[in-house]
Amino acid sequence: MLEMYINNNNTEFQKQQLWTAIVQAKQDGLSNEEIIENVQEALPDAMVFYAETVLKQIDFRAKLSRPVVEFNLEFLFQVIYESVIAGTNDNEILSICAEHCTLNQYEFVRYALEYIHLHRMPSQWEQNNVYQKMIEIVSSSPIESLFEYIESIKNIYLKQIGYELVQENLYNLLLNNKPISYFTDLANQSKDKFIKNYCCRTAVLVARATGKPLDLKVTGDGSIILKETKYLNSEIANNGIVSSNILTMGQAGKLLVDTLEDFNINAKYVDAKNGPTFNRIRVKLERGVSYKKVEDIGNDLVQQLGEELGLKVAPMVSVVPGGVVFDIPRLDRQFAYFRDYFSFDGEPDIYSVSIPGGVDVDGTYVEIPLYSDNVTHILGGGRTRGGKSQFEKAAILYLVRRYPPSVVRLALSDVKRVTFGKFDGLPHLVAPVARDAESTANLLDYLVEEMELRYQEFERHSSIETIAQYNSRFAPDCIMPRVICLIDECFDLLSDDNYCDRIETALMKLLAKAGGAGIHVLLYTQRPDKNVIDPLIRSNFPAKTAFVTTRPEDSCIILGDDKDKRAVYLLGYGDFLYKTTEVLRLQALYVADDEDPEYFQQLLLEAKNQNDPYTAWKSGLDFDEFVASLYDESSSNDNGKFKATTATKTKQSKTDFEGSFSFKVQLDEEARNSIMNLHQKGYQLDEIVKAVFNLSRQDGRSYKKFRNVVEEFLNNFKGGGEDDI
């Protein structure tokens, strides 16, 4: 048969003869390898490739026509997947399936082919081949041709190769000083949403470099409309304020000083800075002028300078060393993308665990050091669309990607069930993400017990009091991991009547001494209600992160200062105040997990598979066993309620009952110290009673009794009397 092929030059006839020969060889019992060997010896390479294709088709057809009544879809998917991997053409697969499958099965085949092409992991050879093809396109054609080639690719892994090449070429075009309109035109020419996004980001970088404001509008059909403000000269373009009269920063500063004089506030212009979110003008108040005069002048400035400075919202006014600053919102605001600040190259610093903070007015990246005594625990909050969730996700993503599980562990609570769900299943988690008040109470109780076991470990070694000292002595041979407990929307948790006592008690214990044991609490809420979040809890957070709030009092509660209302003037979407020993205004990093899911998922995959060369210290406390021990066998008879909460035990230890309806209160040392501490901080009587005894006016006679005791104790203390009542 092969001799007949050699003597005939008609290609189609040759293929038909080769098909017949292969079918006969299969019937004679020859294996695929034996058939290919014979073809390679007698025929040219082109026919060897054709023979391989024929064998794939025969094998695929044989699997579908096996002697059974019917096959399930799982088997069909497996057969299709093997055929695709073997290189069988889609049309050939569909043609064979049309002969052997029902209509429903045939429809399944079509969807299966689409899914396989989209999600299969290509071989290294295939990846290299696609990459070389893209390089050839870039070297010989405009970048639009690369866009078209990427759009024709179905597989997400091969597309990712193209996306990386697109970013490299866009960066080169940026260095070649291409105008903003060039990149927005590229975005409009591409149908791929990720390529559009990369082009728009580059346009934003050009706008930042040239000082030109950028207004990108997306139409209903996905097209991007560019609106640029035309500057009068290059000097103005390099300064940051956009307005109808086009002012330089120096001119804007002098105009601000003149306007302040109209309000009988004498000041002198000092300097100005361009930031990604706002422009900062610093002035020096004349001697004798109080800061209170300018503290709430923001709305008046909008009225007086709204047109000249482009003010649409009141600027934030703050005191800084050497003057007072006015933060003027930028009309061409820039965002800080997470991926632009981290490459995750090199080994992590296992002794200095930190989380991303943001970018300050100078464009400098600022991190939040959890290992610092000025941080340890963080209280944060702000209204919807303030950027709180993005800040939290950036912190988690950074921690799991930068540090292995032996260095950092996570305890997450998400009662909204929408923020932390993407992180479930990570090896860094000490327990599954808590999604209700009960599971959060269990998680916090577990951390309290873990804290105690860590301090017991410290006691076994002389001169060790903190996790920093422990790791300094024993790491890297044995490292005690830091545990970051991040709680989203604590308002719902602390409003739960069944579990609020347990949660409050556990939080108080953790905030009191868990920082030294390497357990850090990050507590966030949209509603920082002073009647819900215990004052004693709020006062034990050394660090605060305040996102934009709706009410001035919310700003005061988060920042721990009843006079600091500045969070009301924040711009939202990641603009926040970071307070420790000083207050910084930062732009939080934007994770963009919805805009760029491939990058987000890639970091999660790397976090799961990262190398962990360290040996972690283990307390031996198993979460599931610990939770089971919290409930006794009779829990089913009392509807699963916790036997005796720590809060109840604490309250009983502070009271000496003398009958059913009357009792004498005797304050122990802990209660006296707590009362004095809160009193010195300016807390009112009802706030102290709530913090120390967990009682409010709704508790009736019990509340009145304890309130009288606290009041008498404070009066006696002022008068030099006895502490006990």
Swiss-Prot record:
Segments forming domain FtsK: 363-556
GO molecular function term, any single one: DNA binding
Highest taxon listed in the record's lineage: Bacteria
Residues annotated as binding ATP: G382, R383, T384, R385, G386, G387, K388, S389
Keyword annotations: ATP-binding, DNA-binding, Nucleotide-binding, Plasmid
InterPro entries: FtsK/SpoIIIE/SftA, FtsK_alpha, FtsK_dom, P-loop_NTPase
UniProt cross-references to PROSITE patterns, sorted A to Z: FTSK
Keyword Methyltransferase assigned: no
UniProt-listed Gene3D superfamilies: 3.30.980.40, P-loop containing nucleotide triphosphate hydrolases
Family, per entry: Belongs to the FtsK/SpoIIIE/SftA family.
Other comment: Although strongly related to FtsK, it lacks the typical transmembrane domains located at the N-terminal part of FtsK.
Functional note: Probable DNA motor protein. May track DNA in a ATP-dependent manner by generating positive supercoils in front of it and negative supercoils behind it.
Protein's recorded name: Uncharacterized FtsK-like protein all7666
